[in-house]
Amino acid sequence: MIGWCTIVGYGAAPGFAQPPHIGAPAIPPGPPGIALPSLPDIQHWIDEVIPAPPLAPAHADSPLVDAAQLTPDLAALRAATMPAAIGDSFVDDWPDGLDDVAPGGIVAVRDVTATAAPTLIVPVRQVLQLKYRTDDSHDESSYGIASLVLPVGDWTGPGERPVVVNNLPIDALGRDCNPSYTLAHGFSRASNFTGYILPTTQLALLRGYAVLITDHEGPRMAYAEPIVAGHAILDAIRAVRNQLPDELGDSKFGMIGYSGGAIATNGAVKLMSEYAPELSDVVVGAALGGVPADFSLLAHSMNANLASGVFLAAVFGIGRERPEVLARMNHLAQWVAVSVLNSQCSEVFTVPGVLQLPIDIAANTPDPLDSDLAHEIYSITRMDGKKSPVPLFIFNGEQEFWVPAVGAKNLYREQCALGVPAVYRSVFGEHFIAAATGYPESLSWLDQRLQGVPAPNEC
């Protein structure tokens, strides 16, 4: 989640140029918190004293739960941890026959201009919400929802109207926290205002660009899962081209995302070559900042301190897609995971961070962040060696302690070594301030790509 911060405008801002060869940085010390060793005795005591929550059996035919390969107990737990329905069938209902629809194929469309326009502040011609086929993290059929915002007026620039893919940091566990919910239903307690703090949508619309905003956590609200997010974004681009072939079929697309939106953007560019190779000539670049590119770093920087609530929510979000993670929860964590907390937005689950609890308190195994399973998840979500087929602009706060800059620098090094034209900017600030200090240049860089200016390469 990005905090409240000041945006200084839509133009180039002074960034601190990174030298071509960045020295190997050390992981900065995390903020002060409770430094506890593994807690096997407390874990054992929790499971002895607290019974497991009573759970109804999972429906065998539920694609949301996908219980076929799970034990009955784990299937029941997974079913109980899924996000609550929000009373909007467009969002809640799993479409029939998804296996027969190609990724990016449209399954439903609705016009939400009447409710969306007041929330967008700037004038718009139309806002469409697309429901389309995508794949989950295991390449099984799923569905995605994306909102396409079309500006007023004709496009007067060269070629077709460009599209900005604005990957917001949704950072949430409930479906009503998605940007599509606010656009379809108006402002609510669940609305995420990050899109106004970093006003990419508004600036792009005033520029004459269309804007695509994806609910990139998927129907399971798999917060922090980059493969789900990457697939959802790539298939959203396919869906737009399928829905409006005459207006946007030959358009260029450019991506931008910060923090949780950078997780999604990173997933999209790293998976593009293998999942949607035809988009390599359609997407002209991606700008990403505050990049949680390596979760093994966050295991040190966000555990047992004020960020622990967000970190626990991210682990839980990944567990929704990877139930082997859910199987490592102790009884206390299971009670929390099946409670109303499992469908909340970030302003709720950040609060437990004041307790500065280590993740060990929720696990049923010692050293859960150094387990074989943890290292497997780190490797899968890091997507080592996958090359972006499009140019990259990467930035990170040099004083960052929640999401250490070493992760972004390593991503930059990796992509440079793979031959990707890339730029890295080390900007002033920790996570919240750096969102503002790095934003103007990243948006200017993306604008230049959409205008057809060749991407610089500072590798």
Where are each of the predicted segments found?
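Catalytic-loop region of hydrolases
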Residues: 18-144, 150-155
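Accessory cap/linker subdomain of secreted extracellular hydrolases
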Residues: 37-101, 289-387
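Short, surface-exposed "cap/lid" segments of acyl-processing enzymes
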Residues: 136-203, 215-217
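Alpha/beta-hydrolase active-site loop
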Residues: 196-199, 223-245, 270
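Primarily recognizes the serine-hydrolase "nucleophile elbow" in alpha/beta-hydrolase
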Residues: 238-309
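Acidic catalytic loop of the alpha/beta-hydrolase fold
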Residues: 262, 295, 398-403, 432
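C-terminal catalytic histidine-bearing segment of alpha/beta-hydrolase fold enzymes
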Residues: 375-378, 393, 402-459
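Short beta-strand/loop motif that positions the catalytic acidic residue
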Residues: 388, 393-400
